[in-house]
Amino acid sequence: MGYVLITRKGCHLCEEAEALLAAQGIACTFQDVDADENLKKLYTFRVPVLLREGRVLLEGKFTLERLSKKLSL
């Protein structure tokens, strides 16, 4: 199972997270937090949220340092 990035339309932090992941060559699927009631309940105030196998790896402001630590880049 790969990475899943929970995002929201118009979210600048989500756009930054997506760009950072792409720059590091990390492929992920995207899910809109507002399109799923369960995701909305869990993550509405936490986006962007990076998941792997259902586990939260990062949320909020993504930085290269935080990403590197979590993914051992």
Where are these regions (language model features)?
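Thiol-based oxidoreductase modules, predominantly thioredoxin-like and allied folds used
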Residues: 27-37
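A short, hydrophobic beta-strand/beta-hairpin element that forms part of a small beta-sheet core
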Residues: 47-56
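Small/polar loops that bind or transfer phosphate-bearing groups
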Residues: 6, 31, 59
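Non-catalytic, surface beta->alpha helical segment in thiol-disulfide oxidoreductase systems
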Residues: 55-73
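Short conserved loop adjoining the S-adenosyl-L-methionine
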Residues: 40
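Local sequence-structure signature of Cys/Sec-based thiol-disulfide redox active-site neighborhoods
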Residues: 1-24
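Surface-exposed interaction regions that form or flank ligand-binding interfaces
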Residues: 43
